Every structure is written in C-alpha cells, then in structure tokens.
Amino acid sequence: MKTIKYLSMLALSLVMATSCMNDFDEPTFEQPPFGNNEIGEANMTIAELKEKYASTISANGAKEVTEDCIVEGVVVANDETGNVYKQFIINDETGAIVVGVNDVGLYAMLPIGQRVRIDCKGLHVGGYGYMAQIGGLYDGSIGRMNKSVFPSHVRIIGAPDSTEQEMKPEVIDDSFFTNDNKAKLAKYVRLEGVEITEADGTALWAPEELKNSSNVVERHIKMGNTNIILRMSTYADFANEAIPTGELNINGVMTRFKDYWQLVISSTDDIEQISE
C-alpha cells in the first residue's frame, strides 16, 4: 500500500512539474541576442553629428555627448580578417564615421552589411588626425569605448544585407582628394583602374620584416596627383599573400591621418584584377 501511495505521489509530482514547464514562453528569436533593443529611432545623421562636433574633431579633441543622440548606419568595414583592429566603420547616406571599441571579434556581432544604431549619449565624439570617431576618452583624447559599455549603446537592426544602398561604393577620382572633403572621410569608396606601386609579382602585402611600430606595412597607390597609402596589418589573414599586379578596381574605406590619405580594405575580396 505504501508503495502504491508513493508511486501515485511521484506521478502527480511529474505531472505538476511538466505543467509548470509548459508555463514558460517559447523563445521567439525576434530580437537580436546582442545589444540594446530599447534604443529608439535615429534622430541625427552621421553628417549632422560630425558637423555638431566639427571643432572638437578638427582639434583632435574629445567631447562627451550629453544630449539624446542616436545615429544609424551600415557596417562597411570590420575586423574579420584582422586588417581592421578594435573598430568598425558605419556609413549612412550622408557620411561615415569610425566606432572604436576596446574588444576583438566585433565582426561576429557586426558583419559587413549589418545595419546598426548607436546611442551616442554618454560616449565621446572626437578626432584623430582629421578622422571622426565615436568612442571613449583616452588621456584626454578620443579613444575606444570600454567593451563592457558597448552593448548598451548599440542596437542591431535586421539581418546583414549586402544590397543596402550604403554598401554600394562611391566611385571616386582625383577630385575627391581636397581639404574640403572631410565630411566623406571613412566613406566606402571604389578606385578604378589603379595599380599598387610595390606589386611586382612576388612582393607580399605585409611581411613581418617590413612592419612599423604599429605592425603595419604601407603600400601605395597613385591616383592622378594624389598618393594614397594602403595600410596593411601584419595580423591580416592575407598578410603573406602576393600583391596583385596590373590594373585593379579596389573597394575600401577612405581615411586620412593629417595630410596623408589612406585606404583601408577589410578583405582581398575588395580587390578586382582587371589586367595583369
């Protein structure tokens, strides 16, 4: 009799446990698991943000954003191949900006073509050699935001989409390179029919023996009267691949450090060889 009573109580407990388990909601996966899904609509374009802090950016300073400020853009460069480090770049239809985060592997949450919103309130906006950046404060200048801060300031919108308007690079020529064109710094662009000066069929992108103190090897492109530096990291997946020869079409992010124009590519997929 005791055995029957025990088994009856056990069966009842299992039924109750199953019933309680069924009370939990099924996961929907409608919201991204990373970031802050409470961030609202964008209320400022990237161009407006850069204009608002223009004096701080041009002075290579940094200023905390104290008002409500949300920008939205599409990721056009990230750290997936190692040629970009602890930052990603977003473009909207008005401009582009660097977002610095003291973390690696950002591409896992922010692949190329991913639309994001950045809540700038509480972060800093500043300039480093003319380049506008959203990030944190570092020794009184603009630096990377702490990785623990970042998730509360970013919202992922939808799935990555390579057909986004911002993913269509702007084809540029020598007229692009003027001092008045700072609004387009960090813009995703396309250089057509250019050659890399060092390409001879055997030269590698970024061999260790040629690196500078930043673990970067500089390669060069001449477009009209403008010299463009290709910054190649020795940590890039393609660092020891041969530089393609002949005429090339190259997609990348156009940056500037003081008086030097620099092109950053995320991958060798950004390069199309049109003649050898």
Q: Which residues make up each language-model segment?
A:
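Bacterial N-terminal signal peptides that target proteins for export
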Residues: 1-8
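C-terminal motif of bacterial Sec signal peptides marking the signal peptidase cleavage site
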Residues: 16-19
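OB-fold nucleic-acid-binding modules
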Residues: 21-85, 89-276
